[in-house]
UniProtKB/Swiss-Prot annotation:
The modification Phosphoserine is found at residue 782. Its EC number is 3.4.17.23, 3.4.17.-. A motif (Endocytic sorting signal) lies at residues 780-783. Residues 19-606 form the Peptidase M2 domain. A motif (PDZ-binding) lies at residues 802-804. This is Angiotensin-converting enzyme 2. Residues 771-804 are annotated as: Disordered. The active site is at residues 374, 504. The modification Phosphotyrosine is found at residue 780. Residues 761-804 are cytoplasmic. Disulfide bonds join 343-360, 529-541. It is a single-pass type I membrane protein. Glycans are attached at residues 53, 90, 298, 431, 545, 659, 689.
């Protein structure tokens, strides 16, 4: 009895302690929510002001507001850690405390946190204000509008190449040193928060613990992404082969029938969405176009009309109207007052019921669908606004992105477009129009999945340290070729930072959300279509006007982050994992059609071919065999010297052979395919236009003209510095120079030796002359040797010298 009594008493004490801790935690969080609302709003408002008016003054105000918010959050995070999660039974309180106990950037020292903030601001500014000088017009073109127009509409291979390279040279090279520092600091922050690296920190958004069967790990996300990509890949390969065949008609001399696709030909600056390739790839051109851009222009649509129609869609499924503040404060078009702004479309939940969208809307079907996507974010924000501050977010980042995409799937259907008067009432759907529609959808949806998967995989590997910074670009394009089937149109060395030329990378966004959202959106779409009682093919489903579907979706949206995402997913679709079957079901008719179209085509891609292969010259260098122990190290400095030497040869050739002054520089000599045993390929572009590749024959002529000079620069000859395909000059092998002091010493010693020899021979000659003169009158002629007299006139010279 006594033991039981003490056990019962202990349980009562523990329960009382837990109850006290929970009450204290509840009071703490209520106070936090109230204070966080104000400070977070001021920080978000300052950020909005900067993004819609990029000035030094606004960046200063933004930094000050962020500093206040960070200091507050750091202190609150420290206080939250005093509450033991084991003593909290209320799951809502526990989730809030767990979120707040993550210190974020406040885990860094004040100095490093400030530096990271400075880096992020600089990267944002460089991206948002980057411009490229057009050599034809001498006009500086920004990304929007300007370069994006070229990448969306131009069919000029070289014009597209100029825009593609210009953006990466002007923006990417500036971002490179900042991004290197960014990786180090973000990794340090992540490890201070008990994550392996920053990629692991990002994957933490999907982690669910303490939820039993609904638990989900960060490692599981990686496995699910790999699994689903393997299932999607056959569809992508068929789409890739079809697009390649079509692009060969537009760019016949620039596409390999078995190779990768040049990155600058894929519809936008990054090759992320292939939507703009539709006009080049439409299967049945004689059918009415399902791209309603022209109809929108003819009917005088503007940005406000686009967003009003998007609002009507949401209202038709019983979701709320936008607030008046939304219409008053949003930036739906690019300002005409000269302000510099961040044009990339984004939805903003500033707090306190202040919801806004920032977008430089153009009257196109693509922006019509983007408006639905961004307004989907706002609907999600409004739905969970009643949740505590720390739970006002999507169930995971992919959910937030998927909501708007669900609406885009319906808004793109011919059924919905006819209802808006954007397709003729007599528009007839048949097999050909359906294939046209599905191909257009696939260019946007399927075409982007490998891009997204590969980009995030590269970043995860960078953060994990699996790709050293000395190989960032090499590995980036290696993975791009292997995974995406896309090749760089010009080789990029380690001065570039091509990934950071995308908004989401420069602005520090996790990117895997755009992969997971695509899987989720089709799972959601299939489930909501069933709720809407749709019958027939999934790709024909339009849930507009279905209040039942809207209410089912709204129930999930209101949860925010208060429940595990695995549970929220199960509530909608019936399972708690990512499943690609709905996506594959949606595109099944297209997949079948593509396989038939590609019957006689190569499906897949070789990674060996590049657009510049035909104009490249291979070089092999043998330092050891030529110089032995005196061989020097081949490094970046030597490569720079090589490029400069080729530039010199090009200048000389154009001057002497063509009577032209062309100022080639080392940056006009492009090097690729570098191997450790010192071999590489190179080609040359015009200094006036990077898209103008100098014909290989011209470069070969220039090399022949200056071959001896190039050999001398590297202390090599034609055998140890080989330009494959260029005949040897048959010039004499290189002879190393002699040191000057050795020459002087040799001359002096030679003079001394010659002087000594001259003196010796002069002495001998004089003696002989003297002896010859004496024999003409012999003073000893009277001496009679027979009588034993000594002839003193005849003595051996050696005897005379010895006696001396």
């Amino acid at each position: 009895m006594t033991g039981s009594f003490w056990l019962l008493l202990s349980l009562v004490a523990v329960t009382a302690a837990q109850s006290t801790t929970e009450e204290q935690a509840k009071t703490f969080l209520e106070k936090f929510n109230h204070e966080a609302e104000d400070l977070s709003y001021q920080s978000s408002l300052a950020s909005w002001n900067y993004n819609t008016n990029i000035t030094d003054e606004n960046v200063q105000k933004m930094n000050e507001a962020r500093a206040k918010w960070s200091a507050f959050y750091e202190e609150q995070s420290r206080m939250a850690k005093t509450y033991s999660l084991e003593e909290i039974q209320n799951l809502t309180l526990k989730r809030q405390l767990k979120a707040l106990q993550h210190s974020g950037t406040s885990a860094l020292s004040a100095e490093k946190s400030k530096r990271l903030n400075t880096i992020l601001n600089k990267m944002s500014t460089i991206y948002s204000t980057g411009k490229v000088l057009d050599p034809n017009t001498q006009e500086c073109l920004a990304l929007e509008p300007g370069l994006d127009d070229i990448m969306e509409n131009s069919r000029d291979y070289n014009r597209r190449l100029w825009a593609w390279e210009g953006w990466r040279a002007e923006v990417g090279k500036q971002l490179r040193p900042l991004y290197e520092e960014y990786v180090v600091l973000e990794n340090e922050m992540a490890r201070a928060n008990n994550y392996e690296d920053y990629g692991d920190y990002w994957r933490g958004d999907y982690e669910v613990t303490g939820a039993g069967d609904y638990d989900y790990s960060r490692d599981q996300l990686m496995k699910d992404v790999e699994r689903t990509f393997a299932e999607i890949k056959p569809l992508y390969e068929q789409l890739h082969a079809y697009v390649r065949a079509k692009l060969m008609h537009t760019y016949p001399s620039y596409i390999s029938p078995t190779g990768c696709l040049p990155a600058h030909l894929l519809g936008d600056m990054w090759g992320r969405f292939w939507t703009n390739l539709y006009s080049l790839t439409v299967p049945f051109e004689h059918k009415p176009s399902i791209d309603v851009t022209e109809k929108m222009e003819n009917q005088s649509w503007d940005a406000e009309r686009i967003f009003k129609e998007a609002e009507k869609f949401f209202v038709s499924i019983s979701l709320p109207y936008m607030t008046q503040g939304f219409w008053d404060n949003s930036m739906l078009t690019e300002p005409g007052d000269g302000r510099k702004v961040v044009c990339h479309p984004t939805a903003w939940d500033l707090g306190k019921g202040d919801f806004r969208i920032k977008m430089c809307t153009k009257v196109t079907m693509d922006d019509f669908l983007t408006a639905h996507h961004e307004m989907g974010h706002i609907q999600y924000d409004m739905a969970y606004a009643a949740q505590p501050y720390l739970l006002r977010n999507g169930a995971n980042e992919g959910f937030h992105e998927a909501v708007g995409e669900i609406m885009s799937l319906s808004a793109a259907t011919p059924h919905y477009l006819k209802a808006l008067g954007l397709l003729a009432p007599d528009f007839h759907e048949d097999n050909e129009t359906e294939i046209n529609f599905l191909l257009k959808q696939a260019l946007t949806i399927v075409g982007t999945l490998p891009f997204t998967y590969m980009l995030e995989k590269w970043r995860w590997m960078v953060f994990k340290g699996e790709i050293p910074k000395q190989q960032w670009m090499e590995k980036w394009w290696e993975m791009k070729r292997e995974i995406v089937g896309v090749v760089e149109p010009l080789p990029h060395d380690e001065t570039y930072c091509d990934p950071a030329c995308l908004f989401h990378v420069a602005e520090d966004y996790s990117f895997i959300r755009y992969y997971t959202r695509t899987i989720y959106q089709f799972q959601f779409h299939e489930a909501l279509c069933k709720t809407a009682k749709h019958e027939g093919a999934l790709f024909k489903c339009d849930i507009s006007n279905s209040t039942e579907a809207g209410q089912r979706l709204l129930q999930m949206l209101r949860l925010g982050k208060s429940e595990p995402w695995t549970l929220a997913l199960e509530n909608i679709v019936g399972i708690k994992t990512m499943d690609v079957k709905p996506l594959l079901n949606y595109f099944e008719p297209l997949f079948t059609w593509l396989k038939e179209q590609n019957r006689n085509s190569f499906v897949g891609w070789s990674t060996e071919w590049t657009p510049y292969s035909d104009q490249s010259i291979k070089v092999r260098i043998s330092l050891k065999s030529a110089l032995g122990e005196n061989a020097y190290e081949w490094n970046d400095n030597e490569m720079y010297l090589f490029q400069s030497s080729v530039a010199y040869a090009m200048r000389k050739y154009f001057s002497e052979a063509r009577n032209e002054t062309v100022l080639f520089g080392e940056d006009n000599v492009w090097v690729s395919d570098k191997k450790p045993r010192i071999s590489f390929k190179f080609f040359v572009t015009s200094p006036n236009n990077v898209s103008d590749i100098i014909p290989r024959t011209e470069v070969e002529n220039a090399i022949r003209l200056s071959r001896d000079r190039i050999n001398d620069v590297f202390q090599l000859d034609d055998n140890s510095l080989e330009f494959l395909g260029i005949q040897p000059t048959l010039g004499p092998p290189y002879e190393p120079p002699v040191t000057i002091w050795l020459i002087i010493f040799g001359v002096v010693m030679g003079v001394v030796v010659i002087g000594i020899v001259v003196l010796i021979f002069t002495g001998i000659r004089n003696r002989r002359k003297k002896n010859q003169a004496s024999s003409e009158e012999n003073p000893y002629g009277s001496v009679d040797l027979n009588k034993g007299e000594n002839n003193s006139g005849f003595q051996n010279i050696d005897d005379v010298q010895t006696s001396l």
